[in-house]
Amino acid sequence: MKIGLASYECRMNDIGFNLKQIEKAIVESKDADLVCFGEAFLQGFAAVTSDYEMDIRMAAEQDSLPIAKIRELSLQYRKAVMVGYIEKDGPDIYSSYALIEGGSVIHNYRRISKNWKNYNITNGNYREGTDTSPFLFHGVEMTVALCGDLWIYPESFRSRGLLIWPVYVNFDLDESESGEYAKQAAMACGKALLVNPLSKEPLSRGGAFF
């Protein structure tokens, strides 16, 4: 299985633009079987304001139109997609990462660490997940961790398979810094794929590493 890491630009609260970027990356991924995007790529990481009324309107349900568009793209181009998004589930909001193939969401990971929002002011409807179990995809054991998950709870992601680690960082991942990320990933898994989106506001410098 060939995996593409899509370090493409996303824009805050511009789902239309970000969906076009997802399609562009899928097309440009050529013979990749799976294309992985960064954390909260659909809406943009800073789309979370920690104002509940604003955020619940911004968040996307699994059966929402934006997710339906990605499901459609997975069918059209016959590729699997992994993408970060701010998820709405009833009255609750999560930072999630969906695996979509053949027009269906086949796995949905919810971030377990709380520092994706201002937890000092958010209400109880901003939730974290609890399930970090590996899953099989095309015969490959995979685990997903979102950004701070792996810094705070590395022991929760130990696996002999492949770790997918979408992040959102606003500094250059130079040799020394990427080395620190590699060390952190190695605490959980021997093989890891890290993907960071590009963004002008707030700044995110991108990057894709194995």
Feature-to-residue mapping (PLM):
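Active-site beta-strand/loop signature of hydrolases that rely on acidic residues for catalysis
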Residues: I3, N18, V27-E53, S74, ...
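Recurrent small/Gly-Pro-centered beta-turn motifs in extracellular repeat architectures
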Residues: Y85-I86, N196
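Amphipathic, non-transmembrane alpha-helical secondary structure
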Residues: G16-V27, A68, Y153-F157
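Active-site catalytic loop in hydrolytic enzyme cores
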Residues: K88-G161, D174-G179
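Glycine/Thr-rich phosphate-binding loops of Rossmann-like dinucleotide-binding domains
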Residues: N13, F45-A46, L173
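Short, glycine/charged-enriched secondary-structure capping and boundary segments
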Residues: L19-K20, T49-Y52, S96-A98, S159, ...
